[in-house]
Every structure is written in structure tokens, then in C-alpha cells.
UniProtKB/Swiss-Prot annotation:
Protein name, UniProt field: S-adenosylmethionine decarboxylase proenzyme
InterPro entries listed in its UniProt record: AdoMetDC_fam_prok (IPR003826), S-AdoMet_deCO2ase_bac (IPR009165), S-AdoMet_deCO2ase_core (IPR016067)
Entry's EC annotation: 4.1.1.50
Top EC category: lyase
Biological process annotations from GO: spermidine biosynthetic process
Organism from which the protein derives: Marinobacter nauticus (strain ATCC 700491 / DSM 11845 / VT8) (Marinobacter aquaeolei)
Domain of life according to the entry: Bacteria
Length: 263
């Protein structure tokens, strides 16, 4: 049982969780590439993103103060929510290192926090590989923890590759005046993921514990070509062509996962 920290005044720690979520696809022709980007634009438009972030706010136990959202031309969307912490009971103020809920189970000062999402569809003009990136930031102050939204967000997008960063900044004082630079135990972001999510992804941690900085990279283990080709069935492809497409897609995923080009 985690011991409750008795604070002097408000909890001034800022906890920030950042996601980069990638969906990768193969669209062979120019028409298929345009259709894929149009599909992604519709699937993750500002209205849908607003609903996802509204669910995020509910999961972390906060209230929405203001919403700003925009669909962009030719592609992309963004949503920003200003949120505030409500009164939490001891049971709700939970920073325990454990997974948060899945989707089906559910920019300010001091007690004001924010959540944002921006989308970036793009495609390669020659090799047929298209990617969709969603950047999501959840920043909270006070008792509420952004770590509980991990599972929900990963399952809300077609997440082939995910990079997650969590950091705690500032300090808060206990009743004796001692400064505390983090108010909960954590040794890995992975401990906040459900077992099925952990089993589904290859993961690497790069953590700087003394700086309260945690980083996890995730790449989907299972590869089914039918889930990656757009506008055609993988079974209708020539075996050599199918293998070539799979090689290109796997290379794209590896390059994004390791943040470097593969020669």
C-alpha cells in the first residue's frame, strides 16, 4: 500500500505524458494513397479527436474548461482542451503503478492542466508507403495522473509503432517543508500497460531515473499483410510482390521504432 504524502498547500508537480502514435499502410497507386489519406482524415477528424480527449479527461478524473479544435486543409486536425482537477477522494487520487482502463471500460496554472492532439497524414510518392502520426500530450498538475490513459489511447488508434515519454517537473513540499520532486513510485511506463498490450508489442525502455524522465518505444509484434494494404486484398497479390511490400512496410516500422534510417 502506497503511503500518502502529506503536503503543505497545493501539489505543484507537473506530470506530462507525450505520445507519438504511428499507423503504417501500403497504398500502391496515387488514387489509393489519396483515398487512404481521405479515410484517415475522416476517421480522425476534429470531432472524433474531441471525443477521444473527452474520454481521456474522464479517465484522469478532471473537468473540461475549454475546447479549441480545428480540421486543416488539405489534411490533419488538432484539438486542445483546458482542464481542471476536481475534488478527489483518497481512492480516486491513485498514482499506483498499475494499468489504466481500456476504451470499452470506460495550458494553464496551478490546478489547470491541458490535453492536446495533432494529426499528421503523409505518404511517399514512389514506394507506396503511407503513414499517419498522432501526437498526443497530457499535462496535469496536482493529484491527477496522466498515466492512466495509456491503454485507452493505444487502443483508440491503429497503433503500429508508439513512442511514449513521461516526465515529472517542479517540486512540492510536505508539512515539514521538505521538497519532493516526484510523488509516486515508477520504474517503467510498461507497468501501466495491461498484459495483453505488453504481449502485443516489442518494447524498449530508456529511462533517466534521477531526472524523473521515462521513455518507452513500442512496435507491434504481429504482422498480417491484410492489415496494411489499402484498397486491395493481400491474397490477390503476386507472392513476390506481396513479399516486397511486406519488406518495405517492416523496414518503415523499424526505422520509425529506432528513429534512424536502415541502409
Amino acid at each position: 500500500m502506497e503511503t500518502k504524502l502529506q503536503l503543505h498547500g497545493f501539489n505543484n508537480l507537473t506530470k506530462s505524458l507525450s505520445f507519438n502514435i504511428y499507423d503504417i499502410c501500403y497504398a500502391q497507386t496515387e488514387e489509393q494513397r489519396e483515398a487512404y489519406i481521405d479515410y484517415i482524415d475522416e476517421m480522425y477528424n476534429a470531432e472524433r479527436l474531441t471525443q477521444i480527449l473527452t474520454d481521456v479527461v474522464k479517465i484522469i478524473g478532471a473537468n473540461v474548461l475549454n475546447i479549441a479544435r480545428q480540421d486543416y486543409e488539405p489534411h490533419g486536425a488538432s484539438v486542445t482542451m483546458l482542464i481542471a482537477e476536481h475534488e478527489l477522494s483518497d481512492s480516486e487520487a491513485n498514482n499506483e503503478e498499475s494499468p489504466g482502463p481500456l476504451p470499452d471500460t470506460i495550458v494553464a496554472h496551478l490546478d489547470k492542466s491541458h490535453v492536446t492532439v495533432h494529426t499528421y497524414p503523409e505518404s511517399h510518392p514512389h514506394d507506396g508507403v503511407s503513414t499517419f502520426r498522432a501526437d498526443i500530450d497530457v499535462s496535469t498538475c496536482g493529484l491527477i495522473s496522466p498515466l492512466k490513459v495509456l491503454n485507452y489511447l493505444i487502443h483508440s488508434f491503429d497503433s503500429d509503432v508508439v513512442t511514449v515519454d513521461y516526465r515529472v517537473r517542479g517540486f512540492t513540499r510536505d508539512v515539514d517543508g521538505t521538497k519532493h520532486y516526484i510523488d509516486h513510485d515508477i520504474n517503467s511506463i510498461q507497468n501501466y500497460l495491461t498484459e495483453d498490450t505488453q504481449n502485443a508489442y516489442q518494447m524498449i525502455d530508456v529511462n533517466v531515473y534521477q531526472e524523473n524522465l521515462f521513455h518507452t518505444k513500442m512496435m507491434l509484434k504481429e504482422f498480417n499483410l491484410d492489415n496494411y494494404v489499402f484498397g486491395v486484398n493481400a491474397g490477390d497479390l503476386d507472392p513476390a510482390e506481396a513479399q516486397s511490400i511486406e519488406d518495405r512496410l517492416r523496414r518503415e516500422m523499424l526505422e520509425i521504432f529506432y528513429s534512424r534510417n536502415v541502409e
